[in-house]
């Protein structure tokens, strides 16, 4: 015969792992083509010059250069990659 009463069950106790979203390369940082700049859900930030947008709205660099964030009139942040000045 069991010496313990049956334990109750809990209906909580689950959580999903964080999705690692956010800015990966900040303003002024240098990037090479293909580097991920921002991981996001939806288009919180829009792609500007020399920035591509992935199927999951990830923004990535299309060329080598420096990251630039600009807040536009419509309130959205546009992310672009400025080309490095030619060294002479």
Swiss-Prot record:
Q: A GO molecular-function term, please?
A: structural constituent of ribosome
Q: Does the keyword Phosphoprotein apply?
A: no
Q: Which residues form a coiled coil?
A: none
Instruction: Identify the keywords attached in UniProt to this record, alphabetized.
Output: Ribonucleoprotein, Ribosomal protein
Provide a GO biological process annotation.
translation
Say yes or no: keyword Transport present: no
The family annotation for this protein states: Belongs to the bacterial ribosomal protein bL27 family.
Output this protein's name: Large ribosomal subunit protein bL27
Specify the species.
Answer: Gluconobacter oxydans (strain 621H) (Gluconobacter suboxydans)
């Amino acid at each position: 015969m069991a010496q313990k009463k049956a334990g109750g069950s809990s209906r909580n106790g689950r959580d999903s792992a964080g999705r690692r979203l956010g800015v990966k390369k900040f303003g002024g940082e240098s990037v090479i083509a293909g580097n991920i700049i921002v991981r996001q859900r939806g288009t919180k930030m829009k792609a500007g010059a020399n920035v591509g947008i992935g199927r999951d709205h990830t923004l990535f660099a299309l060329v080598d250069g420096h990251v630039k964030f600009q807040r536009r009139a419509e309130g959205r942040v546009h992310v672009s990659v400025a080309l490095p000045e030619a060294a002479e």
